Amino acid sequence: GTEIEGKTLGIIGLGAIGAKVANAAHALGMNIVGNSVVVHPFLTAPCKMYDDVAEMVKVCDYVSIHVPSLPATKGMINKDLIANMKDGAIVLNYARPDLVVEEDIIAALESGKLRKYMTDLADENLINKPGIVSTPHLGASTKEAEDNCASMAVDELMDYIENGNIRNSVNFP
């Protein structure tokens, strides 16, 4: 492996989670670059923003994905984007499985273009493949995370009752 201090982390999606990842990585000495439609106020780390993901990944040792699954983001990590990445880059996908084209990830790992692909969303096509690190999807399975979800639900309900605001809806346009 290599040290991460001084390396560049590119974050695709600087919402609440992406911003926290950026702050933590910066605290560990990483340089942060980003591409995001919206930047969450949690972001306190210095972050050079790129309008074009293909340009951003050219400078990244690591690329971390934190975007929702939308028509515009499905398959965004594909052979064309990977071709723009530094040789030996590492891709981290802890967001959604359909953001990557699995065949393109496997081909890039086999050719050495990518050094690693890390995910907690792997299906059987990716498990036990060389260069793939797969962990269980347990990020929200802590006591604190459950407490935070309950607190957020209460806050959102109160905001709706008191002000008519609907945020973070999964079924309201």
Residue ranges and their predicted role:
Residues L14, V57, E146-A150:
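Amphipathic, non-transmembrane alpha-helical scaffold segments
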Residues M30-N31:
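Residues at the starts of beta-strands that form the adenosine-phosphate
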Residues K116-Y117, D123-P173:
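C-terminal helix-to-coil terminal segments
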Residues I12, N35, T119, P136:
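Active-site flanking residues adjacent to catalytic metal/cofactor-binding acidic residues
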Residues G1-E5, P97, V133, G139:
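Phosphate/diphosphate ligand-binding glycine-rich loop within oxidoreductases
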Residues V37-L126, S141:
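Rossmann-like adenosine-cofactor binding region
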Residues G1-K20:
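Glycine-rich NAD(P)-binding loop of Rossmann-like domains
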